[in-house]
């Protein structure tokens, strides 16, 4: 272990605080602030680009930032954060995690560069897409530091880093965009601000913390890679399925069409957020009930959560049909004409988002049942379905076709995970009855 001063100094000391005991309330509040700003930034930036740089630029940004750039984030992220923050016994050091993340980040940059080289984009679009890949990969690298903050019981530092990095990069991006109206220039400023934020709020801070081991053991990075390869495939395939309709629209329609689709797709992030708030508080209870064999209680919680999601779905679909397009048009005035024909498409996306919430409920059930291999099988099957169907639906139906295939893919995942969850539930019930008999 490295011996660090107990009382941090300099700029890092301002971020860390005076070294007094960290309260749970402080951790929760800063984590909520950071998470909210991080999630909110995507919507703010998307709206700003459409309004300040135009519909075509909005479509390019939607693809670069929320689709391909985010996909490269997932690849660099490697699905490893849940593993790192729960590794409180330090099977792996921070140096091990950082070493593997540097490799995955480097590979994500190379894939991003290769993609724009063969994409046939104009120089400007290729540069914007690649810059957003760099932006997101830096985000993934910062996540390693922020996971280490959390593992050390300093979740508030994770929240502060998220909050301050987001504010800095968004302010630089919006300031440049407002002054120049050029998305490429704004993207350069955003990447510069992201690098500065990473150095200020992650690198400088972690060097002032005690008990952070930078050394990486021999062969540890490969062992860590092997331990998390299933998580990697899960997050990469999951995001591809989630974004397949966007990829198809980017490939077969105009950039401004993708801007419209990105606008009506925006409510899915709210649905995912609400679903997380509904499901996650019950995960520990579900895990305990499953492990202790209280299957009736387990089934009851699943049923009640499904009913809550169903009720929220009815409200969301009704709201989307009556108010969805008018509200989104207020947020995106430049897209009002394109949005005017998208009421059905919006409702399909809302239904797809609800199906995704059901899918997550069954996904967590399979995780609790320790059936991760079946999760990978489901993702692989539906990924093939996405590759085969997304382009065809978009060519045939445009934005509405994209919305329909999104709903279809979410339904396929939900059914796949739901069937396996029910099957393993019945299998355990039969085993219980056999043991009792």
Residue locations for each model-derived region?
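Signature of the first transmembrane helix
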Residues: 4-11, 20-78, 109, 170, ...
């Amino acid at each position: 272990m490295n011996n660090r001063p107990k009382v941090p100094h300099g700029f890092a000391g301002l971020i860390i605080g005076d070294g007094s005991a960290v309260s749970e309330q402080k951790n929760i509040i800063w984590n909520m602030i950071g998470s909210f700003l991080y999630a909110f930034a995507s919507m703010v930036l998307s709206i700003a680009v459409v309004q300040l740089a135009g519909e075509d630029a909005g479509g390019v940004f939607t693809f670069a930032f929320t689709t391909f750039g985010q996909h490269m984030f997932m690849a660099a992220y490697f699905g490893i954060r849940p593993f790192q923050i729960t590794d409180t016994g330090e099977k792996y050091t921070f140096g091990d995690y950082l070493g593997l993340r540097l490799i995955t980040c480097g590979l994500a940059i190379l894939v991003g560069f290769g993609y724009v080289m063969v994409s046939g984009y104009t120089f400007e679009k290729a540069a914007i897409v690649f810059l957003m890949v760099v932006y997101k990969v830096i985000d993934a690298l910062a996540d390693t530091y922020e996971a280490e903050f959390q593992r050390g019981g300093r979740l508030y530092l994770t929240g502060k880093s998220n909050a301050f990095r987001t504010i800095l990069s968004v302010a630089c991006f919006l300031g440049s965009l407002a002054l120049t109206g050029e998305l490429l220039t704004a993207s350069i400023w955003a990447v510069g601000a992201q690098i500065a934020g990473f150095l200020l709020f992650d690198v400088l801070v972690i060097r002032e913390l005690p008990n952070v081991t930078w050394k990486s053991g021999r062969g540890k990075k490969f062992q860590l890679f092997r331990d998390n390869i299933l998580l990697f495939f899960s997050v990469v395939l999951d995001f591809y399925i989630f974004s397949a309709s966007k990829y198809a629209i980017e490939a077969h329609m105009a950039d401004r069409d993708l801007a419209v689709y990105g606008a009506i797709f925006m409510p899915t992030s709210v649905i995912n957020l609400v679903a997380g708030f509904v499901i996650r508080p019950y995960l520990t209870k579900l895990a305990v009930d499953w492990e202790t064999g209280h299957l009736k209680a387990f089934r009851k919680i699943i049923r009640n959560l499904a009913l809550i999601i169903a009720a929220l779905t009815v409200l969301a679909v009704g709201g989307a049909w009556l108010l969805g397009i008018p509200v989104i048009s207020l947020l995106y005035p430049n897209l009002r004409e394109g949005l005017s024909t998208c009421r059905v498409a919006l409702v399909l996306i809302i239904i797809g988002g609800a199906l995704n919430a059901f899918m997550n409920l069954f996904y967590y059930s399979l995780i609790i049942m320790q059936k991760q291999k079946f999760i990978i099988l489901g993702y692989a099957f539906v990924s093939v379905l996405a590759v085969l169907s997304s382009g065809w639906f978009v060519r045939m139906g445009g934005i509405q076709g994209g919305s329909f295939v999104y709903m279809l893919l979410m339904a396929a995942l939900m059914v796949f995970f739901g069937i396996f969850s029910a099957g393993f539930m019945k299998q355990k019930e039969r085993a219980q009855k056999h043991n009792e008999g």
